[in-house]
Amino acid sequence: MSAIDKEAVKQFLLSLQDSICQQLEQADGTALFEEDAWQREPGERLGGGGRTRVMTNGAVFEQGGVNFSHVAGKAMPASATAHRPELAGRKFEAMGVSLVIHPKNPYIPTSHANVRFFIAEKEGEDPIWWFGGGFDLTPFYPVDEDCQSWHQTAKDLCAPFGDDVYQEHKEWCDKYFYLPHRDETRGVGGLFFDDLNEWGFEKSFAYMQAVGEGFAAAYLPIVERRKETPYGERERDFQLYRRGRYVEFNLVYDRGTLFGLQSGGRTESILMSMPPLARWEYRYEPQACSPEALLYSDYLKPRVW
């Protein structure tokens, strides 16, 4: 197995955060990210620090957050050891970049991406490590061209790593970003992977890099195509209603959110994925044959793109 290089992973993640922020600022044309660099106090349950960057009230993006964090703890939280009992009693480090973009225009999909590295160590034993991550798209008024180009970018970046990688990680994404209480997928998916170490460090790291860099390549062309689409109050209301699903998923099911909160992570950074505005409506039903109804009938279930 190739040597584990934690510093190389960290430097890649820092440069990825810089690159994505620059590209999003360019796409917005008005707003800039504000950085909040933070460091854990000695003696806290979780050590380490990070850079939280948030953009608000842009011309294109209502709110966007791009987080880097590198934290360490003396014991893994329950959310991690539940499916990996061998991690109990090990000290750990977790580092990653996580981002969520909430555009103003309802015709631009919300998007999310995350790439991360975990290592859990115990004296006298081999380290347990893995990579995880992915990206997914949540349209409110989906356009097939956008969904297809998003998945094509995902397919292309997976190709060098194996013939089955796209299909496996696409299906994993469909299963992961699913709300059982609504019987809906969160959006049209993308890629999701976790616990990746069977390829060895070098190839696993290379794949994580490809996914991290693939996000902007997949998302920004969609932003450009849709940012001038006219919309009114009806579309805005529906966007805010559907953002409620984003909140439901993140607070009830998302493993990263649960891990962060259970391990004593930085709450403000963890919850920066929340939309600035969302709404709920009792027993909402879209009008028959409307564009809103089309989202439910055709897009909130796994599809071949």
UniProtKB/Swiss-Prot annotation:
The residues the entry assigns to the signal sequence are none
Designated name of the protein: Oxygen-dependent coproporphyrinogen-III oxidase
Task: Name the enzyme's class.
Answer: oxidoreductase
Q: Which GO terms describe its biological process?
A: protoporphyrinogen IX biosynthetic process
Purpose of the protein? Involved in the heme biosynthesis. Catalyzes the aerobic oxidative decarboxylation of propionate groups of rings A and B of coproporphyrinogen-III to yield the vinyl groups in protoporphyrinogen-IX.
**Cofactor(s) the protein requires to work:** a divalent metal cation
Origin organism is Vibrio atlanticus (strain LGP32) (Vibrio splendidus (strain Mel32))
Cite a single GO MF annotation.
Answer: coproporphyrinogen oxidase activity
Pfam families per record: Coprogen_oxidas
Which gene carries the instructions for this protein? Answer: hemF
Annotated a divalent metal cation binding lies at 102, 112, 151, 181
Which PROSITE patterns does this chain map to? COPROGEN_OXIDASE (PS01021)
